[in-house]
Amino acid sequence: MPHELATQARVGPVVADVMIRYPKLCGTDTTVGQARAYLADDHVHALLVTHDGVLVAVVEREDLTGAAPEEPIWLLGRLGDRVVGVDDDLAVVSREMNEWGRRRLAVVDRGGRLAGLLCRKRSGQGFCSDDGVAARAAGRGRPM
């Protein structure tokens, strides 16, 4: 699901309009053991691994299968179909998310720097927001 970055005049909503701007991040030193602990939370579906602000991998549960607890996770994840651009057309991306059965996509700027996370609500109706994530974390007594 790789996307060409938008080069035309803006017509409708783009990914940046609805993305979570403050997603949880992991560094390249994050281990499989740590990742498994993070992913034990049923609201965490993917780990965004960055180095100096640049997205280097998106890691999902299935990427960790068979990996040793001390292994770094960034080597196990991938980008490609797990990433969209900030200026990508939201309607196109939303349709592709439905077709591919994806609820989470990392969002990067033109330089590959992480800009946020596009997160479809469990209901499939709309996208998660920073306020919604913060409220859920506060209600569960967990830090964001």
In which residue ranges do the predicted regions lie?
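Tandem CBS (Cystathionine beta-synthase) repeat/Bateman regulatory domains
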Residues: M1-M144
